[in-house]
Every structure is written in structure tokens, then in C-alpha cells.
């Protein structure tokens, strides 16, 4: 499993729109290191995050915050993903708010799932894929 993400040197900077550092992810250690910084799954023109600046992507990221229910029995946990996505390659990284209270919600599993895809340069197709 190989894919690229683009990062900044910042952590938790929600107003940041620049992601100039390309990181090729080849293994768990690469992803762990890169995910420690703010990052995106898309290469953007001039490294500036904007739909109109979309160049390409080879990975789709799904955020799982378990925000739909307060019932722990209904929460999705990383160990459940293999059964949910059989025969699908993916990588999981805990979010920085994993098992912490957030936005008035109790501590719960919060994580990101990275699904490598065939590289696309079609922003509309990529956006549709993310909405599935």
C-alpha cells in the first residue's frame, strides 16, 4: 500500500490552508510520522487547499468521530473495520481527540481511515467518491 499525503509543519492549525510537504506513505511508520502534523490527502496547486486548486489524489480519508450516538455499543471501533471493508486495503490512525471529550460529547473512539485509490485528477469524481 503506497499513497501520498501533503502536510504542513503545524499541528491543530484549523485556519491553515498550505500543505507544501509531500509525504509518500509506504508503511505504518511513515503514516504515523506524517499524521502527526496537519495534512491533506490531495495535491493542490501552489500547495494551497482549495477545490479549484485540486491537482490529484491517490487516497481517500474517512473520519470516524462516532458522533451519531452516545451509546458505546453503537460506536465503530478500528478493529471492526476489516469486517466492514473485506478485501479492501486501508490504514487507520487515531485522531488527536481519540478517547477525549470533544464538542460536549464524551470520550470515544475517534480515528481516520486511509483508503488508497487509483490516482485521479478529476476533482468532481474525487468529491463524489468521498461522499459515498
What are these regions (language model features)?
Residues 1-111, 115-131:
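Signature for HUH/AEP ssDNA processing cores
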Amino acid at each position: 500500500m503506497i499513497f501520498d499525503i501533503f502536510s504542513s509543519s503545524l499541528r491543530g492549525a484549523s485556519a491553515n490552508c498550505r500543505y507544501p510537504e509531500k509525504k509518500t506513505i509506504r508503511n505504518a511508520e511513515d503514516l504515523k510520522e506524517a499524521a502527526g502534523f496537519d495534512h491533506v490527502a490531495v495535491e493542490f496547486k501552489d500547495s494551497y487547499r482549495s477545490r479549484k486548486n485540486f491537482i490529484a489524489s491517490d487516497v481517500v480519508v474517512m473520519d470516524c468521530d462516532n458522533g451519531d450516538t452516545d451509546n458505546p455499543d453503537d460506536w465503530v471501533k478500528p478493529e471492526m473495520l476489516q469486517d466492514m471493508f473485506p478485501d479492501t486495503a486501508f490504514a487507520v490512525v487515531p485522531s488527536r481527540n481519540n478517547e477525549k471529550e470533544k464538542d460536549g460529547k464524551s470520550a470515544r473512539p475517534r480515528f481516520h481511515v486511509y483508503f488508497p485509490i487509483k490516482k485521479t485528477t478529476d476533482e468532481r469524481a474525487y468529491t463524489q467518491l468521498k461522499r459515498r
